[in-house]
């Protein structure tokens, strides 16, 4: 097209793989210890409130990572199993802050690190009000998901951001049985918010899998008991949207089964206030009832 400017951008999975490979090469070529670990802030490029710490110990030992809160109640810690080679995620860093992080061996030595993070929100406070208590929320966070170009973020009891994604992944986030999360991709295939499919990512932001769907994804997806995934979609070659669901093979990404709601529901019955012929159903959520297999 005359006058158009084209730019090639590597897929985020490729960018992350290159960054991880460079980190591992540095780690394996160096002598990193508990006292002098390798610290990689935002290793996977999309979560500036995370880091990865890598070091070796002479004996296999469990290690606890603690991110100290601005107040005692904001402290977050996690203990990792015994190993000699430790490549550990650091989650729960504050935005625009010199975070104090402790790495401690089980019944052994410890080191305190300072990890400085950028101001993800450019001086703005994204939370107007947080009505909870540290006794109730403890070290958990409340995750807020966008449907456009806002930041996907999680906030602690005090309303402080402790996790975010700076790439515009959208809609619901679901915790998977393996500890990763399922989230819509950042790759828009049609306005206003139909994405290429789903990512399985770690909370550090590492993408393990992308599930691409011909009709894209929107709003919601859930993991089944067998690990396969139910995801909301549509057929973009037709005149309607948000009126289909598919079952995705967790390992291969193959579509095992699809449901087109127009085959068993009559469009136009029970219209909502925002009803249109194109978006007649506007499916916002999906769930599975094991008792009725429906």
Pin down the residues of each PLM region.
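Extended, solvent-exposed segments with strong compositional bias
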Residues: 68-69, 79
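Histidine-/acidic-rich catalytic cores in large beta-rich domains
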Residues: 3-18, 25, 31-67, 86-87, ...
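Short, solvent-exposed loop/linker segments at beta-strand-coil boundaries, enriched for Pro/Gly
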Residues: 71-73
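Short beta-strand segments within Ig-like beta-sandwich modules, predominantly Fibronectin type-III
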Residues: 77-83
């Amino acid at each position: 097209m005359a006058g158009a400017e084209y730019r090639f951008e590597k897929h985020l999975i490729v960018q992350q793989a290159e960054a991880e490979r460079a980190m591992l090469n540095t780690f394996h070529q160096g002598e990193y210890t508990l006292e002098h670990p390798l610290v990689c802030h935002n290793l996977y490029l999309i979560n500036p409130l995370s880091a990865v710490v890598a070091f070796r110990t002479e004996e296999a030992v469990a290690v606890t990572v603690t991110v100290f809160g601005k107040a005692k109640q904001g402290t977050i810690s996690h203990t990792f199993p015994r190993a000699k080679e430790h490549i550990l995620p650091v989650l729960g860093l504050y935005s625009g802050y010199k975070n104090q992080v402790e790495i401690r061996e089980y019944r052994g030595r410890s080191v305190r690190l300072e990890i400085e993070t950028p101001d993800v929100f450019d001086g703005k406070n994204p939370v107007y009000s947080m009505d909870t208590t540290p006794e109730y929320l403890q070290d958990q966070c409340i995750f807020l998901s966008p449907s456009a170009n806002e930041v996907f973020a999680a906030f602690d009891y005090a309303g402080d951001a402790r996790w975010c994604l700076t790439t515009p992944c959208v809609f619901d986030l679901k915790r998977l049985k393996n500890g990763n999360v399922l989230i819509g991709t950042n790759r828009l295939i049609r306005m206003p918010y139909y994405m290429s499919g789903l990512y399985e990512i770690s909370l550090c932001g590492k993408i393990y899998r992308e599930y691409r769907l011909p009709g894209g994804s929107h709003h919601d997806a859930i993991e089944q008991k067998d690990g396969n995934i139910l995801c909301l979609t549509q057929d973009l070659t037709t005149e309607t949207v948000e009126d289909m669901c598919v079952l995705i093979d967790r390992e291969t990404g193959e579509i095992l089964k699809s449901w087109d709601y127009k085959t068993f529901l009559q469009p136009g019955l029970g219209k909502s206030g925002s009803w249109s012929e194109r978006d007649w159903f506007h499916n916002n959520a999906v769930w599975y009832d094991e008792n009725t297999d429906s």
